[in-house]
Regions:
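Membrane-lumen/periplasm interface segments of specific transmembrane helices
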Residues: 121-156
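Membrane-interface helix-loop-helix junctions at transmembrane boundaries of multi-pass membrane enzymes
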Residues: 185-206
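Membrane-embedded helix bundles of polyisoprenyl
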Residues: 32-47, 56-64, 85
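Transmembrane-helix motifs of polytopic, lipid-linked glycan transferases
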Residues: 5-25
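Membrane-interface alpha helices of multi-pass inner-membrane proteins
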Residues: 81-97
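Perimembrane helix-loop-helix junctions
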Residues: 102-126
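Juxtamembrane membrane-water interface segments that cap and precede transmembrane helices
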Residues: 1, 149-172
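Membrane-interface transmembrane helices that cradle and orient dolichyl/undecaprenyl
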Residues: 65-80
């Protein structure tokens, strides 16, 4: 039961951050917890998600990384925000190496948010490297260098990542449901996007 309790605590934290993310950046025009309610509903109807997975921790880091990326919007001193954003990207990529691919998207969005400068780029690079530097120190001290090499070796093994045949029917059903929700949300965002502020439209286009 310990892993389930930890898993539910992580889900509760993610739900709280979803509410704060919306309230902080006005992604939805009103203060709402609908996104958290839908998230909890999906978790509830999927018994397999009640256990603790690596992806739970990575998802929390992903959400915090988005928060700091959004905070960097049109900031003249954005190096600190991008440092923290890429720190959580780097930390998450240790557990899920393919997470590193998001770094490219994050840099493109930082450029679109007018927060990418040579200084902030160096801050982002240092933020991504810091978790690996800490991992290297641990691996070197305990003579377990394979632990440091493992994320880089797994980074290129993405063959099974897109293999839908290994998914169970309930997993495919959830993916289909999420796809429908994405299409409906995207159409609504395009149709009603002119009513939002420029900053909000930039956030929604990223999401």
């Amino acid at each position: 039961w310990a892993d389930r309790i930890v898993s539910f605590l992580i889900y509760a934290t993610i739900g709280y951050f979803l509410i704060e993310l919306n309230n902080q950046f006005s992604i939805i025009r009103m203060r709402a917890s609908m996104q958290t309610a839908i998230y909890f509903l999906l978790v509830t109807v999927c018994p397999k998600m009640h256990y603790l997975y690596t992806g739970d921790i990575v998802a929390l880091g992903f959400l915090i990384s988005i928060y700091f990326l959004f905070k960097s919007y049109q900031q003249t001193q954005a190096a600190g925000y991008l440092f923290y954003s890429f720190f959580f990207i780097g930390a998450g990529s240790i557990l899920f190496p393919q997470f590193t691919i998001l770094s490219v998207l994050w840099l493109l969005e930082a450029y679109r948010f007018q927060s990418l400068t040579p200084r902030s780029f160096c801050g982002a690079l240092l933020g991504w490297m810091l978790p690996y530097w800490m991992l290297f120190g641990h691996a070197f001290f305990y003579n377990e260098m394979e632990l440091f090499y493992r994320p880089f070796n797994q980074l290129l093994t993405i063959g099974e990542f897109f293999n839908l045949q290994i998914l169970q029917p309930w997993e495919l059903a959830i993916l289909g449901y999420l796809l429908v929700m994405f299409i409906v949300s995207a159409v609504h965002c395009i149709a009603a996007g002119f009513e939002d502020k420029i900053r909000t439209r930039a956030y929604l286009q990223f999401l």
